[in-house]
Amino acid sequence: QCETPYFARRRKLIAAVLDVCLHGKSADLSPVEDGLWCICEETTWAISAHANLTAAHPFPISSEPILDLFAAQTAMVLSFTLTLLDDWLDSSLHQRVTAEIQRRAIDPFLHRNTDWWMGFTRKDLCNWTPWIVSNVMFSARCLTDDPLPVYRRACGMLDAYLRCIPADGGCDEGAAYWNMAAGSLLDCLELMAEAGLNCWDEPKLRNMLRFPLLMSLGNGYFANFADCDARPVMYGERLQRAGELLRDAPLTAMGQNLRGQPTDCIGDVPHFSRLLQ
């Protein structure tokens, strides 16, 4: 009941942004403005399942922002919106959105050590780490003059995540989780490549990026285990990019074959950065 309108609001915003990008002055900017303002007015950007609500404390606290998967992803969506429509948006709206991204995503990322997925208090990490880190990195890249403080802190978190991954690069949650595990790690590494990082020959990384290729049974079917479907939605554009960076022709071909429509990236979980790739 909570997640349906939550994700619908973000899908509508992305669609409205694309409408303005495609049609320019003939497009209606008000759905973008309304979407941005409504999201800024939300008490929390975390979904209810991640908000740590209890009978004693049934409401989120706005002064204690929760940085979960979708709070980070919301920050990314808003950051791309501000970047794409920088000249179109009123300066006061731009300032409000920027301040909310800073308060809810970038500041907690830089100054808090208690979130389990950061790897400071817990060692058994999962796709939460690269998923959140990648979206905060996108936000910092779009909105800050110097994203390097975020990138440096991201390196420590990603190192902790990589220590949890076996040498064979396997994902114990199944092939579908590659999208937001190794696929999100790929997002991080491409951003860091702007600062000179080159790690594409690292054996564990290569194995992680090639994992779906090993799980493929053909015709869109994958060996399924944990809670992974036998025919999962795979982000073909990320697989293709991984294949190109690794100079791996079979992986590149798999990505090309699995590329869907742009609207697939705003389906269940709106992902603006993947939509633009």
Predicted regions and their residues:
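Non-membrane alpha-helical segments in proteins
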Residues: 7-22, 34-38, 72-84
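Carbohydrate-active enzyme catalytic cores, enriched for enzymes
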Residues: 182-277
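Structural helix-adjacent loops and short alpha-helical linkers that scaffold large soluble proteins
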Residues: 20-33, 81-102, 140-155, 192-205, ...
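Active-site lining segments of carbohydrate-active enzymes
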Residues: 58-176, 187, 271-276
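Alpha-helical scaffold elements that line and support the substrate/ligand-binding pocket
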Residues: 15-16, 20, 136-137, 178-192
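Alpha-solenoid HEAT/ARM repeat scaffold
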Residues: 10, 14, 30, 69-72, ...
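Positions within ordered alpha-helical repeat solenoids
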Residues: 18, 38-41, 45, 80-84, ...
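Helix-terminus loop motifs that line ligand-binding clefts
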Residues: 26-66, 73, 169-177
